[in-house]
Amino acid sequence: IGGIDLYKSLNAGNSWEKVNDWWEYYGDPSTYLHADIPAVQFLKNNNGTEMIYVSTDGGLYDSNNQLHSVENLSLDGLGVSQYYSTYTKREDPYQIFAGSQDQGFQRSTDHTNSIYDFEQVVSGDYGHLSSGDDGVSIWSVYPGFAMYYPDASSNISGITWDFEMSGALWLPPLMEDPYDPSSVYLAGGGLSGGHHILKLTRNGNSIQVDEGDYGFNNTITAMAY
């Protein structure tokens, strides 16, 4: 039975056992199921072994031992992500960055083969990737914070600002600052209500926030210049 977690029964449903807690995925994505289970399928392989395939919001898993253990098939080479946003560097080496649904911020930096593999840097939902320096640094949003990678091709963790505003979208749009790549404009929301454009600027290992004076009548859904 699938929900947020997956449960199994080996006695015709008289008792149930949770395969793993959703949060255990972050300790070892290769052997723990990701949260949210939309489908489970039983199949036999060519040797007659019953295989169980589990679809999750973080990829596809299989098990050959009645879910005593699972293996993540999506960590290497299998493209199963749903992308909210992508950004491609405009000059060689043409690295690609992506914000995905539940499979986090990803990047593809090795293009020696015709098929590009992507590395998942962090899990979660990321969108509206933006850069003011042609992809050297990347801004992104998550439901609850904005994040900045000063060196997007190598940084493991980003600098974040938790949303201290109301009235914004679930993934509020971003727009790069054409003069300062360490700054970005975010569609609010407002720090004290209303709907304003916020300017986020990296300040060391933190992010400074300045709210525009003009108040819009409704939620801001898009920005461009």
Please describe what each predicted stretch is.
Residues 1-225:
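Beta-propeller blade termini and top-face loops
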